[in-house]
């Protein structure tokens, strides 16, 4: 019976065939496994002669055609290869000649904008911060601001004038503190006396209430103001702050020194 008329058996893909039960060890797996079609048998490769094989051809650049035919409706794509993916085209002869001649390659507008202009000294000088009063230049804005605040002679001559008197001040804060001596915004509610500072008003109110929170640690005296206590502590110290030039006596207060000088200082002979 010919092999082409063999009866097809149900094939199980998960089960390995038993080659000992077959007439030939060649197993044919075809995508069309139907009972109505016979399965052809391919002969063994040993029966093929050496002349059936084509000789091995070596691919060289000389053997490649200059222009391969393309189907109609398709245009050739430059810079691409069918097997190796994208291949960058070789540089043209004009570009290579310019590079070897020493001329610069073209630069895009974005690269030219981002490239630092180090060759232009005027551009570097323009980036410095210059004082408009004394023409001094600084590399940072903070250095220029510090110069204007402290070291610039022209800036130090700028002053703020008081509208109530002829006094002038360098800073605006000092002028505002001086204006309080004219306006006297702190007013006593008991007697109507006005003061320029709130702590001066607080010390004045203690004269009405009789409160003396600052007491001397050496004696029983107490004071309403801290400055009066500091002046009193000079009486207990061995070295007084104010000294007479004639008799070298020392006093705790300037007022006591003035009384001593007005009474007639006795010069020691």
From Swiss-Prot:
Keywords annotated in UniProt: Cytoplasm, Developmental protein, DNA-binding, Metal-binding, Nucleus, Repeat, Repressor, Transcription, Transcription regulation, Ubl conjugation, Zinc, Zinc-finger
Posttranslational mods: Phosphorylated by GSK3B. Once phosphorylated, it becomes a target for ubiquitination.
Family of the protein in this entry: Belongs to the snail C2H2-type zinc-finger protein family.
An annotated Gene Ontology molecular function: DNA-binding transcription factor activity, RNA polymerase II-specific
GO BP, sorted A to Z: cartilage morphogenesis; cell migration involved in endocardial cushion formation; cellular response to epidermal growth factor stimulus; cellular response to ionizing radiation; cellular response to platelet-derived growth factor stimulus; chromatin organization; desmosome disassembly; endothelial cell migration
Any one GO CC term of the record: nucleus
SMART domains linked: ZnF_C2H2
Pfam family membership, one: zf-C2H2
Comment text on domains: Repression activity depends on the C-terminal DNA-binding zinc fingers and on the N-terminal repression domain.
Region feature (Disordered): 81-117
PANTHER family according to UniProt: ZINC FINGER PROTEIN (PTHR24388), ZINC FINGER PROTEIN SNAI2 (PTHR24388:SF42)
InterPro entries with a match to the protein in the record: Snail/Krueppel_Znf, Znf_C2H2_sf, Znf_C2H2_type
Domain of life: Eukaryota
Zinc finger (C2H2-type): 129-151, 160-182, 186-208, 214-236, 242-265
UniProt main location, coarse: nucleus
Protein name per UniProt: Zinc finger protein SNAI2
Subunit structure: Interacts (via SNAG domain) with LIMD1 (via LIM domains), WTIP (via LIM domains) and AJUBA (via LIM domains). Interacts (via zinc fingers) with KPNA2, KPNB1, and TNPO1. May interact (via zinc fingers) with IPO7.
Subcellular location: Nucleus; Cytoplasm
Lineage of producing organism: Eukaryota, Metazoa, Chordata, Craniata, Vertebrata
Function: Transcriptional repressor that modulates both activator-dependent and basal transcription. Involved in the generation and migration of neural crest cells. Plays a role in mediating RAF1-induced transcriptional repression of the TJ protein, occludin (OCLN) and subsequent oncogenic transformation of epithelial cells. Represses BRCA2 expression by binding to its E2-box-containing silencer and recruiting CTBP1 and HDAC1 in breast cells. In epidermal keratinocytes, binds to the E-box in ITGA3 promoter and represses its transcription.
Ranges where the record places region SNAG domain: 1-20
């Amino acid at each position: 019976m010919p092999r082409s008329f063999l009866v097809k058996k149900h094939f199980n893909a998960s089960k390995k065939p038993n080659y000992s039960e077959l007439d030939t060890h060649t197993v044919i797996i075809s995508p069309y496994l139907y009972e109505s079609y016979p399965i052809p048998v391919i002969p063994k490769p040993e029966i093929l002669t050496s002349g059936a094989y084509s000789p091995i051809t070596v691919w060289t650049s000389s053997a490649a055609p200059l222009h391969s035919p393309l189907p109609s409706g398709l245009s050739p794509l430059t810079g691409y290869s069918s097997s190796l993916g994208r291949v960058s085209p070789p540089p043209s002869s004009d570009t290579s000649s310019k590079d070897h001649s020493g001329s610069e390659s073209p630069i895009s507008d974005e690269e030219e904008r981002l490239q630092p202009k180090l060759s232009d000294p005027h551009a570097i000088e323009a980036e410095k911060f210059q004082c408009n009063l004394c023409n001094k230049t600084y590399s940072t804005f903070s250095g220029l601001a510090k110069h204007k605040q402290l070291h610039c002679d022209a800036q130090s001559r700028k002053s703020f004038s008081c509208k109530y008197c002829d006094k002038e001040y360098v800073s605006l804060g000092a002028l505002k503190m001086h204006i309080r001596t004219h306006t006297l915004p702190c007013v006593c509610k008991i007697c109507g006396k006005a003061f320029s500072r709130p702590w001066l008003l607080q010390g004045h109110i203690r004269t009405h209430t009789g409160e003396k929170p600052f007491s001397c640690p050496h004696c029983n005296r107490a004071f309403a103001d801290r400055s009066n206590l500091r002046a009193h502590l000079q009486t207990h110290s061995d070295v007084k702050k104010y000294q007479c030039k004639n008799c070298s006596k020392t006093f705790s207060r300037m007022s006591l020194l003035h009384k001593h000088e007005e009474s007639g200082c006795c010069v020691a002979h």
